[in-house]
Amino acid sequence: MARYRCCLTHSGSRCRRRRRRRCRRRRRRFGRRRRRRVCCRRYTVIRCTRQ
């Protein structure tokens, strides 16, 4: 199974696997407003990238 680098997307469950720890820290800044759309500023993509 491929690993996904981003945390966000529409089909979140399987994408939210990787980079969870790092995202949790940055997520606090955006609050609940952008939480769904952005996880990590670096990985702001609409689809997950396979590694």
UniProtKB/Swiss-Prot annotation:
Pfam families: Protamine_P1
Expression tissues: Testis.
UniProt superkingdom: Eukaryota
Keyword Nucleus: yes
Alphabetized GO MF terms: DNA binding
InterPro entries: Protamine_P1
Keywords: Chromosome, Developmental protein, Differentiation, Disulfide bond, DNA condensation, DNA-binding, Nucleosome core, Nucleus, Phosphoprotein, Spermatogenesis
GO biological process: chromosome condensation; sperm DNA condensation
Keyword flag Disulfide bond: yes
Subcellular localization, as worded in the UniProt entry: Nucleus; Chromosome
A cellular component term, taken from the record's GO annotations: nucleosome
Post-translation changes: Phosphorylated by SRPK1.
Disulfide bonds: 7-15, 40-48
Function, as annotated: Protamines substitute for histones in the chromatin of sperm during the haploid phase of spermatogenesis. They compact sperm DNA into a highly condensed, stable and inactive complex.
Oligomer and partners: Cross-linked by interchain disulfide bonds around the DNA-helix.
Similarity annotation: Belongs to the protamine P1 family.
Protein name (database record): Sperm protamine P1
Organism: Bos taurus (Bovine)
